[in-house]
């Protein structure tokens, strides 16, 4: 009987997601890459923490993955470097992240809505749809998405920015999972959201102050979730430091994830279209075809309304909590590594070539930034 309820709930979730995307998304949205062959090697060994047998077998036994598998979740406010992070990890031979699924945060949000409504939650319990049944169904759904939308690998990774708002619940589902929280100066994040016209529920792209307030609320939830999960399970990664010092940061990250070091993570741009696939509708795809460079660090300076600049400390108190100076315009993020400075120079020197590569990976070439001629390194 329990098995039947779990199967019915999984079926409901599948139907819900299919209905959502049929009605809310265009048919040519490439969430899944059908051209890739499956890697049939063994998945990673089970972690130290154990779960009851019926939870371990909630997915097909031949998948090689279960709820104790050491999955990797990358999250953060959109436009905070999550795509760069997943591309660098995708360059590692033992890791596969892939494009945003977009469905995993929605499933987590659906469960959150059920949980918040005492009336709805009680109805589910009375129907025999207990928390355990829901957990098994949602974890099975998440694993099906993670396993099915790309190549198999020893370590599977998911990059959906808003999953980090549910890190505590995800840890309940996947006790051996690791989380990477991408953090970026909120002023840069909001400027990028507005300038690139990234639609996020609740963000008014015509109101910089309101967007800063929304950023502050979102990153506060994510930081609190990360800290609740604990430093052994969740690592905060600052976008600025990843760009300025990629080797030091990636060594820190690979050690945290317990995967061997590989220099390929420093040269992800060489694997685009090979081991790394990009979605032509994601707003960052045209940027991550390029090597790690400094161009995006201070593009926001001079774009913020003066009244918002004056009130920044009160508008976005999380800036100071995260270590940013809300009164610094421009800020001093630090001096870049020599390799990063050279790669930035190459991006400028060969701007036309990188521009051609960028327009090939998007469905709207008009949104791709034109090549930069002036060297911005000296401004940092």
From Swiss-Prot:
Topological region Cytoplasmic: 1-6
Enzyme Commission no: 2.8.2.20
Glycosylation sites noted in the Swiss-Prot or TrEMBL record: 66
Keyword Disulfide bond in annotation: yes
Taxonomic placement: Eukaryota, Metazoa, Ecdysozoa, Nematoda, Chromadorea
InterPro entries per the UniProt record, alphabetical: P-loop_NTPase, TPST-like
Active-site residues, record numbering mapped to chain: 100 (proton donor/acceptor)
Keyword line: Disulfide bond, Glycoprotein, Golgi apparatus, Membrane, Signal-anchor, Transferase, Transmembrane, Transmembrane helix
The name this protein goes by in its record: Protein-tyrosine sulfotransferase A
Pfam family, one: Sulfotransfer_3
Catalytic activity field: L-tyrosyl-[protein] + 3'-phosphoadenylyl sulfate = O-sulfo-L-tyrosine-[protein] + adenosine 3',5'-bisphosphate + H(+)
UniProt record similarity statement: Belongs to the protein sulfotransferase family.
One annotated GO molecular function: protein-tyrosine sulfotransferase activity
């Amino acid at each position: 009987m329990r098995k039947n309820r779990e199967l019915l709930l999984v079926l409901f979730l599948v139907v819900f997601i299919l209905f959502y995307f049929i009605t809310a998304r265009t048919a040519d949205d490439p969430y899944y890459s059908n051209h890739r062959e499956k890697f049939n090697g063994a998945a990673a060994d089970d972690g130290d923490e154990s779960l009851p047998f019926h939870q371990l077998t909630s997915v097909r036994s031949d998948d090689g993955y279960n709820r104790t598998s050491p999955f990797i979740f990358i999250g953060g406010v959109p436009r905070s470097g999550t795509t760069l992070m997943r591309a660098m990890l995708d360059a590692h031979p033992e890791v596969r992240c892939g494009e945003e699924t977009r469905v995993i945060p929605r499933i987590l949000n659906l469960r959150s809505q059920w949980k918040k409504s005492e009336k709805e939650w009680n109805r589910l319990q009375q129907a025999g749809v207990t928390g355990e049944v829901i957990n098994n169904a949602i974890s099975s759904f998440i694993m099906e998405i993670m396993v099915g939308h790309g190549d198999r690998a020893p370590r599977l990774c998911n990059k959906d920015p808003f999953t980090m708002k549910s890190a505590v619940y995800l840890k309940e589902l996947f006790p051996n999972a690791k989380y990477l929280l991408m953090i970026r100066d909120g002023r840069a994040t909001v400027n990028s959201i507005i300038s690139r016209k990234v639609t996020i529920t609740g963000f008014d792209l015509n109101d910089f102050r309101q967007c800063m307030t929304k950023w502050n609320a979102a990153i506060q939830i994510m930081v609190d979730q990360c800290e609740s999960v604990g430093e052994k399970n969740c690592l905060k990664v600052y976008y600025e430091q990843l760009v300025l010092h990629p080797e030091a940061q990636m060594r820190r990250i690979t050690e945290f994830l317990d995967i061997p070091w590989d220099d390929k993570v420093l040269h992800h741009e060489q694997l685009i279209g090979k081991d790394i696939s990009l979605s032509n509708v994601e707003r960052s795809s045209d940027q991550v075809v390029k090597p790690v460079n400094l161009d995006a660090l201070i593009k926001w300076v001079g774009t913020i309304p003066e009244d918002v600049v004056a009130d920044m400390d009160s508008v976005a108190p999380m800036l100071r909590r995260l270590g940013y100076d809300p009164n610094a315009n421009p800020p001093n993020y630090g001096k870049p590594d020599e390799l990063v400075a050279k790669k930035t120079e190459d991006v400028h020197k060969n701007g036309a070539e990188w521009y051609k590569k960028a327009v090939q990976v998007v469905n709207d070439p008009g949104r791709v930034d034109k090549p930069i001629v002036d060297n911005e390194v000296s401004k940092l």
